[in-house]
Amino acid sequence: MEINTELIKKLKKLSNIELSPSEEERIKKDLNALLEYQKILDKIDVEGIEEMVSPIEFSTSILRKDEVESFESRKKIINNFPENKDGFLAVPGIHVNEEE
């Protein structure tokens, strides 16, 4: 796969961002460099190597236990948001039209 100008323009539209022509070129160059690096990584033989979740071994959990906490300003935040529905923030959906 190669990142070309057409793909950058499509990503720009999906991301709803504006880029100058020089920024488009820089991003195209950077993404292609990442893909080339991925090709190098793909060639590494990992047969027989055990998968790991983290490179650090944890003998005990360092994560705290989840605890439900009440949040006093929740209603204020929801009421100040431009659009809300059933007590939740409402945001525009992301729909991809393949024809565009």
UniProtKB/Swiss-Prot annotation:
KW ATP-binding (keyword) present: yes
Catalytic reaction annotation: L-glutamyl-tRNA(Gln) + L-glutamine + ATP + H2O = L-glutaminyl-tRNA(Gln) + L-glutamate + ADP + phosphate + H(+); L-aspartyl-tRNA(Asn) + L-glutamine + ATP + H2O = L-asparaginyl-tRNA(Asn) + L-glutamate + ADP + phosphate + 2 H(+)
Subunit structure comment from the entry: Heterotrimer of A, B and C subunits.
InterPro entries: Asp/Glu-ADT_sf_sub_c, GatC
Protein's name according to its UniProt entry: Aspartyl/glutamyl-tRNA(Asn/Gln) amidotransferase subunit C
Biological function: Allows the formation of correctly charged Asn-tRNA(Asn) or Gln-tRNA(Gln) through the transamidation of misacylated Asp-tRNA(Asn) or Glu-tRNA(Gln) in organisms which lack either or both of asparaginyl-tRNA or glutaminyl-tRNA synthetases. The reaction takes place in the presence of glutamine and ATP through an activated phospho-Asp-tRNA(Asn) or phospho-Glu-tRNA(Gln).
Family affiliation: Belongs to the GatC family.
Organism (species): Petrotoga mobilis (strain DSM 10674 / SJ95)
Gene3D superfamilies xref list: Glu-tRNAGln amidotransferase C subunit, N-terminal domain
E.C. no: 6.3.5.-
NCBIfam families registered for this protein in UniProt: gatC (TIGR00135)
Single GO BP term: translation
Pfam family, one: GatC
MF terms in GO: asparaginyl-tRNA synthase (glutamine-hydrolyzing) activity; ATP binding; glutaminyl-tRNA synthase (glutamine-hydrolyzing) activity
Coiled coil: none
Keyword hit for Nucleotide-binding: yes
Signal peptide boundaries: none
Keywords tagged on the record: ATP-binding, Ligase, Nucleotide-binding, Protein biosynthesis
